[in-house]
Structure formats: structure tokens, C-alpha cells
């Protein structure tokens, strides 16, 4: 679980970089939405990993 949380966190960072760095307007909007989605998925997986108690990298 923690492995997936880290993967989604990295994806959200990449999407955030493209969304907030000033690329074109359409791409920035899509990247900001993806950033929010993957950040939420990261937090959900992180909470599930902590609650499971057997989170291994």
C-alpha cells in the first residue's frame, strides 16, 4: 500500500509541476486537476497503509 501511495505522490508532483509552472492554459488546467486527484489518492493510500500496519516499502 505504501508503495502505491509513494507512486501516486510522485505522479501528483509531476502533474503539479506542469500545472503550476506556466505551460499553456489548457494543459495547466488539466495538470492541476490531475495534481488534485493524485494527491487525494496518495492521501487515501497513505492512510490505508498506516491503518493496515504492515506497510513495507
UniProtKB/Swiss-Prot annotation:
Belongs to the UPF0391 family. It is found in: Cell membrane. GO terms for cellular component: plasma membrane. InterPro entries: DUF1328. The keyword Thylakoid does not apply. The keyword Amino-acid biosynthesis does not apply. This is UPF0391 membrane protein Arad_3976. It is a multi-pass membrane protein. Its main location: membrane. The chain crosses the membrane at residues 4-24, 33-53. Keywords: Cell membrane, Membrane, Transmembrane, Transmembrane helix.
